[in-house]
Amino acid sequence: NIERPEMEKRDTILKVVDLTVDKSDGSIALDDVSFEIKTGEILGVAGVAGSGQKELCETLTGLMTAKKGAILYHKENIVGKTPAEIIKLGISMSFVPEDRLGMGLVASMGMVDNMLLKSYTEGKGPFVERKPARELAQKLVEKLAIVTPGVDTPVRLMSGGNVQKVLLGREIESSPQVLITAYPVRGLDINSSYTIYDLLNEQKKKGVAVIYIGEDLDVLLELSDRLMVLCHVKVTGVVDAKTVTKEQIGLMMTGAEAAEAMKETSGQELSADQDK
């Protein structure tokens, strides 16, 4: 079983209101999406592939621009701001994208240079300090048991699990207040997957708000505190992961609103009981 630590006092850190986003071809990527996430919480996101998960991540991090709506970070609206402008506001957000070696890391570079990619935006002068990046790379190798011939070996030569540890490790080390992860265990073996779940729970215990986009419903139900379901670029519900069932999530993934899904499945349970 995956651990789900219980956190006390939690405050809303990010509130999304009526977010509508268009794709470059003019079709709708997100339609009137609203939700909030608290500190020390894992909000799972479930949905059939292509329901708006990728666009949600990219809009929250400033890589895509919303057509309407607001993303309130501690009540400050960050819609329309670039990732660099978001950093300048003192907002600490980390993103672990689905495309690890295309968007997350540079495949031909080693760990050290990939650490530098994150830190150079925060550098104060014209010179890049390699020493802290090398120390960080070595620290991650030890802490996360990353298997690599060396910290300068191109990351494309590593296994998928090790690549993901490098990426998530780097993003966590920047001490984010919000951590957005898209399919972080896709293609990983069970041991690597549990390492990732532990890392996410560690962040939760530090008070980080974690958005976890996943495809395995069992994992989503065990790891998340609340679960948001997307269907055809709309939110069909945000529910308590401890009490909702897999069947209810399945109904919501095919378009049933949360209240409707709860009613329908409780009706099925009643008739099943009567048949006994």
Task: Give the ranges of each region predicted by the language model.
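Glycine-rich phosphate-binding loops of nucleotide-dependent enzymes
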Residues: 1-276
